[in-house]
Amino acid sequence: MDKVLLGALEAGGTKMVCATGYADGTVVESQSFPTTTPEETTATCAAWFKDKGIAALGIGAFGPTAVNPTSPRYGQILETPKTAWRYFDLLGNLQGPLGVPCGYDTDVNVACLGEVTFGCAQGLTDVVYLTIGTGVGAGVLSGGKLVHGMMHPEAGHIPLVPDPRDPIANDGACPYHKNCLEGLVAGPAIAKRWNGKKGSEMADDPEAMDLLAGYLGQALAVYILCYAPQRIIIGGGVGDHTPIVPLSRAKTAEVLNNYIVTPEVADLDTYIVNNSLDGKQGVMGCLELARQALEA
């Protein structure tokens, strides 16, 4: 299996990352394409993979998307703000031209899978992977399996208590929920609050980082209470390029208020951590998803 060439596709709202590699997580080749129309984008990606001779493909898609194989909409993008992509059959438009087994899940679930298989969550059975960038999404591993249920978790949209210091309190950037985590900490919220600036441009502003870390701490406390993970891993542009992760530890502890007493939560420095695979966790998770599809 280690010598069988596999395909990986991170399907994002702004770009598609196509890659080939092996079951041990080694990435052989990768190339990014802009996300344009559904038809053009999938045709470009399928053509790129067609020449590589892959045996299977793992797809991690932006969401919401239908990840339950028994659903009649399995493989489709669902109620996304990207209107042209709503109810587009992403899986079918890739698997059809390629004719190889395909694994399909969300982008954050495959990132979680990457960390569990190759990164800082190896050996763990219960993990939350959170990405904070243009949006906020969470991948959840419970009992050694990625959580799906009726669909995948949408934990980036949990409602939060607005901070009275916040100029966009009750008017966050999420078009669906004004005071959800995504609406208050993702890139568009940062830009709305601070005159178009990026998270990295606000990284040295203590008050700004304290505000964002407070929101993240609220959310992480909820994830701990609901999912009881053995580790929480955070990635994405805002997560990687600001001090929000270390600052959120004290905020999380404040919300929990000593209610959870476990060895893991006692050491938040090793419990709430940044991603460990240098941004490759999504692609590497897709390779693992492809391996699973080939062996199914």
Which residues does each PLM region occupy?
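ATP-binding/phosphotransfer module of carbohydrate and carboxylate kinases, centering on a glycine-rich
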Residues: 1-57, 65-73, 92-102, 114-126, ...
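Residue-level detector of high-confidence beta-strand sites
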Residues: 30-32, 80, 149
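A charged helix-plus-loop insertion that forms the helical arch/lid used to bind
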Residues: 71-87
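Glycine/small-residue-rich loop that forms an oxyanion/phosphate-binding "nest" at active or ligand-binding sites
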Residues: 103, 109
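Active-site histidine-anchored catalytic micro-motif
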Residues: 136-138
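A conserved active-site-flanking secondary-structure segment within enzyme catalytic domains
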Residues: 147-164
